[in-house]
């Protein structure tokens, strides 16, 4: 009897975790924060690959182009 209960609990945990993982991936794809990318417009100063916000185009001679 106890083994059946343990198996049932294990199966329920597996189903719930799979369901939660599936919804988590959907939430990340739909999130506006993930889709929105900030970038520096042309003419703004830049410092290459070490800067936090990249250029919308290319960093050339310390200016975004």
Swiss-Prot record:
Cysteine pairs bridged by disulfides in the record: 39-56, 46-59, 55-64
Cellular component GO terms, alphabetical: extracellular region
Main location: secreted
Annotated signal peptide: 1-20
Record-annotated membrane-spanning stretches: none
Compartments where found: Secreted
Tissues expressing the protein: Expressed by the venom gland.
Domain notes: The presence of a 'disulfide through disulfide knot' structurally defines this protein as a knottin.
Homology family: Belongs to the neurotoxin 36 family. 02 subfamily.
Full protein name: Hainantoxin-X.2
């Amino acid at each position: 009897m106890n083994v059946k209960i343990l198996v049932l609990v294990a199966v329920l945990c597996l189903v719930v975790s799979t369901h939660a993982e599936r919804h988590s991936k959907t939430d990340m794809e739909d999130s506006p924060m993930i889709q929105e990318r900030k970038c520096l417009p042309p003419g703004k100063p830049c410092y290459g690959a070490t800067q936090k916000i990249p250029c919308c185009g290319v960093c050339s001679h310390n200016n975004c182009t």
